[in-house]
């Protein structure tokens, strides 16, 4: 798991475009470029094949509200990489990095996430990573720098979504969770499968140095 460099911003952009599952905001390429410049764009790489298997983005609201808001989204994993808990792990890393490591966080910044009705995949990952539900939210065109028309049902003008906000008091638990993953699980995720046990080793040390997880 790594931060996406400015020169690499199209890698997660084209990955999401290629999967085209219709459950995510259709963010323009420049949103990924801006996130990469701000060190708020992440991707997961299979180092054996050198192929991208997952993405995540923290996108600024772009307006001048007294309370800053950022949208945590773009959470997409290749179907073959699902079921390992990688999405949950990525969101934890994103939030710990954003708040503890990036140097860009401000105490009044709100980190929001929205999940479209019927898309249950990200719910567990968000809850595991310290987000709490804030109820139904209607997202209108222009609320975020992204195209949402493909998510609007016939005859309506909004997208019905479930809203979540990050609980800043959860950051200590997330740091502890990542420390245990590195020091007790040795960065290994194991899953039993009818074809045999599968072990996945995850390294995110270039995003959060292990020494920064010391408790």
Describe every region a protein language model picked out.
Residues 1-14, 171:
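A short beta-loop-alpha structural element at the N-terminal edge
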Residues 19-48, 57:
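Active-site rim helix/loop that mediates acceptor-substrate recognition in acyltransferases
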Residues 49-55, 70:
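Glycine-rich phosphate/pyrophosphate-binding loop shared by adenosine-nucleotide-utilizing enzymes
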Residues 66-79, 114:
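Conserved acetyl-CoA binding element of GNAT-fold acetyltransferases
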Residues 77, 83-100, 124, 128:
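Conserved acetyl-CoA-binding loop-helix of GNAT-fold acetyltransferases
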Residues 103-104, 117-136:
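Conserved active-site alpha-helix within GNAT-family acetyltransferase domains
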Residues 109-123, 140-144:
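Conserved beta-strand-loop-alpha-helix junction that forms the acyl-donor binding cleft
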Residues 139-214:
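C-terminal "cap" of GNAT-fold acetyltransferases
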């Amino acid at each position: 798991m790594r931060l996406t460099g400015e020169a690499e911003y199209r890698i997660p952009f084209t990955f999401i475009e290629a999967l085209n599952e219709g459950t995510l905001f259709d963010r323009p390429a420049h949103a990924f470029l801006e996130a990469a410049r701000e060190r708020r764009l992440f991707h997961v790489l299979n180092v054996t094949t050198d192929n991208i298997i997952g993405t995540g983005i923290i996108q600024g609201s772009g307006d001048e509200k007294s309370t800053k808001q950022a949208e945590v989204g773009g959470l997409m994993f290749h179907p073959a990489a699902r079921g390992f808990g990688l999405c949950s792990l990525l969101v934890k890393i994103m939030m710990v990095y954003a708040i503890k490591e990036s140097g860009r966080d401000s105490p009044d910044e709100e980190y929001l996430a929205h999940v479209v009705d019927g898309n249950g995949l990200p719910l567990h990952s968000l809850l595991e990573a310290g987000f709490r539900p804030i109820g139904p939210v209607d997202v209108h065109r222009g609320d975020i720098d992204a195209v949402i028309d493909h998510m609007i049902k016939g005859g309506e003008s909004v997208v019905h979504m479930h809203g979540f906000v990050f609980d800043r008091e959860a950051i200590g638990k997330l740091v502890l969770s990542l420390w245990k993953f590195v020091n007790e699980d040795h960065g290994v995720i194991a899953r039993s499968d009818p074809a045999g046990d599968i072990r996945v080793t995850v390294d995110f040390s270039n995003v959060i140095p292990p020494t920064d997880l010391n408790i």
